[in-house]
Amino acid sequence: NDVGLLTGSFLKKTALDVLDGNPDINYGSIYENAVAQELRAHGFDLYYYNSKKLGELDLLIQDRNDHVLPIEVKSGKSYKRHRAMDNVLAHPEYHLNTGYVLGPCNVSVEGNVTYLPVYMAGMFHNE
């Protein structure tokens, strides 16, 4: 995963829109790629979760204490909507204590979900 390669593959107009901060662009793939790149740089193996019953999670990582951490990356104002995250956290067989949503937000905690700005992906360390 490389954000530079990803944005380099965009059409010229799309690349200019990204650089100009055009709010009509879906930044989801860029945010997801940036978060994945940052987590990988900090020593995490990255996993993806998809279940017809529970939904899709962008990333799963395992911390040094062997806890599985589900991560959703959001790019829009609806970052507090995360059905799959809620489903996985509530699943009795998974025993997950907390999930993380990285998006266009401030640091906050609501229930068992921690919201972080995308730039804080570098705060996860696995060394």
Residue positions per predicted region:
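A cross-kingdom feature that marks ATP-driven nucleic-acid transaction machinery
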Residues: N1-E127
